[in-house]
A protein has these predicted regions:
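Short alpha-helical segments enriched in small residues
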Residues: 1-233
Length: 233
């Protein structure tokens, strides 16, 4: 196996192991070569779950649940089928991610309108799925190796972007939470200010009442100031 392919597989395995994630595979044109490449790495059982080799269309339908109408209209070598293969493998396996490979290794395209060397790689998780296409020119063996390399690179690229999206979503959620917290603080502060203002008004009114009725110790002896008239005069 080419050293660059081995390096790509090792890089992917480290990423999976570091994050405690597992992967499952669904292969067509590579016939298990991707699974072989990944399980050549010692300790693969920690992150490699299982693999499906669905070479025939019937196998794609039976094993992975690929839509027969999609196969008929789009062809086995298409983005739609690549995504459905990955999603089907994910449903069948207790894994976090799935990689699928479907293409035309050659030497002929067997009547397909797509040229030899065309490949689609599907990547799926529980929350997202994507597919990428490329074309590799070479012998059947070279194409299969190239497909494996492209699948590994695509997986890393998609998962890096997914990680970036996850970070952005977390940052957005944190920002929204901070905005909500500040809003609640402002509302609470405003409510306290209004309450204090109300208490101030009530205190002022009570003070006026005290002044109106307070005698300040100088009691008025009204009876002494009244001239009483004798009714008998």
């Amino acid at each position: 196996m080419d050293a660059t392919i081995q390096a790509a597989a090792a890089r992917l395995s480290r990423r999976l192991k570091k994050n405690g994630k597992t992967v499952t595979l669904a292969e067509s044109c590579t016939g298990g070569l991707l699974a072989s490449t990944m399980t050549d790495i010692a300790g693969a059982s920690a992150w490699f779950q299982r693999s499906f080799v669905t070479y025939a269309n019937e196998a794609k339908i039976e094993e992975l649940g690929v839509d027969p109408e999609e196969l008929a209209s789009k062809g086995a070598v298409s983005a739609q089928v690549a995504i459905q293969m990955a999603q089907g493998a994910l449903r069948r396996a207790n894994a976090d991610f799935a990689i699928s490979v479907t293409g035309i290794a050659g030497p002929s395209n067997q009547g397909s309108k797509k040229p030899v060397g065309t490949v689609y790689v599907g990547i799926a998780s529980r929350t997202w799925a994507n597919a990428k296409r490329t074309q590799i020119g070479g012998t059947r063996e070279e194409n299969k190796s190239g497909f494996v390399h492209f699948a590994l690179l695509t997986a890393m690229d998609c998962w890096n972007k997914a990680f970036d999206r996850m970070v952005e979503e977390r940052e957005q959620m944190a920002h929204e939470a901070e905005v909500a917290r500040l809003k609640l603080e402002m509302e609470a502060k405003r409510a306290t200010e209004l309450e204090n203002q109300q208490e101030g008004h009530e205190a002022k009114a009570a003070s006026w009442q005290d002044e109106a009725w307070e005698s300040n110790g100088d009691e008025e002896e009204i009876g002494l100031e009244v001239e009483w008239v004798d009714s008998e005069e």
